[in-house]
Amino acid sequence: MKKIALVFLLITQNIFSQALIPNPPEVSATSFLLIDAKTKTVITSNEPNQSTGLASITKIMTSYVVADQISKGFITEDTMVDISEECWRMEGSRMFIKEGTEVSISELLKGVIIQSGNDASCALAEKIAGSQSAFADLMNNYAEQLGLDNTNFVNPTGLPDICLLYTSDAADDLVGV
């Protein structure tokens, strides 16, 4: 009886364990790279060197630059930022800050990270570098220091600008971020 139970367990264990393995997901992205974070081993990829628009991934670098400026003592989380008309008029996702108000760096960072706020990204850029384009230059300097050789930022939001090149990057460069 014990042998029959053991054989039954072995057979059912094999059947049920196979049923628990899901099919791999379909990925519609034209370019992607999946790595093991600890070993940096590539698990799967598709066109990882293809340059693509970054969109809101740009805000990771925006937040990184702001955090570094705080750590270097150039600004503090309590530093107040005047909101310009240009930032107030930003399209896309926003934290809905009003022109002429003052908002702390801390609150703007939350707006960038939690709400993907283009208005907050704009305000931080203006405070730190004087303009969005000057902040993009600063972002590109950081990208170069991080070894992101295929990266080009044109603004702190990731929004496309018809007058400028698109913020672009390759999936393999993003591993550095």
Say what each PLM segment does.
Residues I4-T12:
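Sec-dependent N-terminal signal peptides
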Residues Q18-L165:
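Active-site-adjacent loops and short helices of periplasmic peptidoglycan-processing enzymes
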Residues V175-V177:
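Acidic, Ala/Val/Gly-enriched low-complexity intrinsically disordered segments
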